[in-house]
Amino acid sequence: MNSGKILIVSSTHGNEINPVWSVNQYSKQGNIIDKNIEYKFIIGNPLAYEKGCRYIDKDLNRSFNLIKNNHDTSIYEIRRANFLVEKFGVNGSEPCDIAIDLHTTTANMGTSIVMYGRREKDFCLAALLQHKFGLPIYLHEKDEKQTGFLVEAWPCGLVIEIGPVAQNFYDPKIINRFLIIISSLREEINKLKNKQKQLPKLVIVHVHQGSIDYPRGEDGNINALIHPKRMNQDWKPIKKGDPLFMDMEGCTKSYNGKNTLWPVFIGEVAYKEKNIAMSYTKKEVINLPTQICEDFFN
């Protein structure tokens, strides 16, 4: 970390409003700056936030792979992605070393961490939070249909995902969880920097394997919904024969695979347009070399 600044992004999706309230409350309490690390707060997609919609033209959190040499100013989210990188990127006018992207979900994900790829500094931050709070980690990788995430535009970054909460609905419990994470993150980094804390030797992650669409008829319309026994069961294993969907006649469509899966984002409202009913993962234990802590501040 060279600048000692961390970018905290809220409302990357405009209808996820609890993070905005959280950072405003945190700021008013005088917690923006300490002697070691400075937080920079920004609303990711302010126009979508004003309108209460997820995005204007395109999902901002799928736009950061499109900004290089892209001069199409007609797409609001690409303009916004360019602005964020030009201002807060490592070579920007107000450079930040780390980006933390705050999100809410309608799925029963609890408080969780999302990582994109296997960058060592990301593992370092994720391990600190998992060790302190026991948070599950969703490692999203190797999905060609899902790319261009905000935190990938910084050398280190994580998504904090909290749910369930409805879109455009304030929930004090959700807000409080964000406040705890925002406060604790800086404390943990300071402890690590001052050699007051050791990195855990391992981290447990749920590695993305793919996504499942709703069953559909020949007309392309959804003809079965998530099974009642599967709803709200994020992070809980699915084994062969377990129910996944139920159609209008009450018939169950079950999982027929051999391997145990761990589902995430079950029934996420925003993913319906992406033809995703849920994503599924496998568990992996990753050993963390002590060297990544030393490299974190270089």
From Swiss-Prot:
Disulfide bonds: none
Cofactor(s) it depends on: Zn(2+)
Keyword Ligase: no
Record field: catalytic activity: an N-acyl-L-aspartate + H2O = a carboxylate + L-aspartate
Catalytic activity, EC: 3.5.1.15
GO annotation, cellular component aspect: cytosol
This protein's UniProt keywords: Hydrolase, Metal-binding, Zinc
Note on how the cofactor is bound: Binds 1 zinc ion per subunit.
Keyword Zinc: yes
Binding site for Zn(2+): H13, E16, H103
GO terms, molecular function: aspartoacylase activity; hydrolase activity, acting on ester bonds; zinc ion binding
Top-level taxon of origin: Bacteria
Listed InterPro entries: AspA/AstE_fam, Aspartoacylase, AstE_AspA_cat, Aste_AspA_hybrid_dom
Residue positions binding substrate: R54, N61, R62, E161, Y271
Family of the protein in this entry: Belongs to the AspA/AstE family. Aspartoacylase subfamily.
HAMAP family, alphabetized: Aspartoacylase (MF_00704)
Listed name of the protein: Probable aspartoacylase
